[in-house]
Amino acid sequence: MLSRRIIPCLDVRDGRVVKGVRFRDHVDMGDIAELAQRYRDQGADELVFYDIGASPEARSVDVAWIERIARLIDIPFCVAGGIDSVETARRVLFAGADKVSINSPALGRPELITELADEFGVQCVVVGVDSVRETDGQWRVRRFSGDPDKTQAVPLRTLDWIVEAQRRGAGEIVLNCMDSDGVRRGYDVVQLQQARALCQVPLIASGGAGAMEHFAEAFDQADVDGALAASVFHSGAIAIPELKRYLRGQQIEVRDVY
């Protein structure tokens, strides 16, 4: 069985790392390069950088900081935010990113997923899914979630979108359960289980990690391939080496920390 991945997520705004609760009230968490190097040294398996203002502000991601990160770390990293064309994705990948993640642009033009997969290969194409449970009990997707004032509901069931994204060429799905984001009460295991039943590509859990047990629950109960987290790593509440030792003690296979 492949090792499960531990993935710090760094939300980027104006070249700084920020973090909010349920995508609101963002506070500064530090320098992007310093945090990236820290996580690399601690044994992170990969990193995700999300330019949270790019899509809501209808601009492209700034490749200057991508080039800076690529020179500093030697683990895979993915870039998300404002990637709305093959040309933009090419700039991001050529700047040093290993993968691109698309979310709002794919909802506006789903064929973008196929275009990117055809051009760069499915291994480079991640589809991020921001999901909210609505009053009727159904999970539905949101777009432009990087800015609470611009977030839009989309009349599309989360599970239906996961199926369509795979059909169009997504090589990986990151399911961000927005109701859990930043509150540290655990991943939405029920939603992840339903997504896992439909997901034939790697599935990454996002939103809600607050304790080491939450990672184990996502791996054991939802069989996700990786777990993404932000605030617990940025704040120092959980250190990656200790987390990996804990997971190995739970018979969950993770890569060694070198």
From Swiss-Prot:
InterPro entries (UniProt xref): Aldolase_TIM (IPR013785), His_biosynth (IPR006062), HisF (IPR004651), IGPS_HisA/HisF (IPR050064), RibuloseP-bd_barrel (IPR011060)
Record bears the keyword Amino-acid biosynthesis: yes
Subcellular location field: Cytoplasm
CDD domains with a match to the protein in the record: HisF (cd04731)
Entry annotation: catalytic residues: 11, 130
One GO cellular component term: cytoplasm
Sorted UniProt keywords: Amino-acid biosynthesis, Cytoplasm, Histidine biosynthesis, Lyase
Record-listed E.C. numbers: 4.3.2.10
Cleavable signal peptide: none
Record-level GO BP terms: L-histidine biosynthetic process
One Pfam family matching this protein: His_biosynth
Subunit record text: Heterodimer of HisH and HisF.
Entries under PANTHER family matching the protein: IMIDAZOLE GLYCEROL PHOSPHATE SYNTHASE HISHF (PTHR21235:SF2), IMIDAZOLE GLYCEROL PHOSPHATE SYNTHASE SUBUNIT HISF/H IGP SYNTHASE SUBUNIT HISF/H (PTHR21235)
Task of the protein: IGPS catalyzes the conversion of PRFAR and glutamine to IGP, AICAR and glutamate. The HisF subunit catalyzes the cyclization activity that produces IGP and AICAR from PRFAR using the ammonia provided by the HisH subunit.
HAMAP family associated with the record: HisF
Protein name: Imidazole glycerol phosphate synthase subunit HisF
Record gene name: hisF
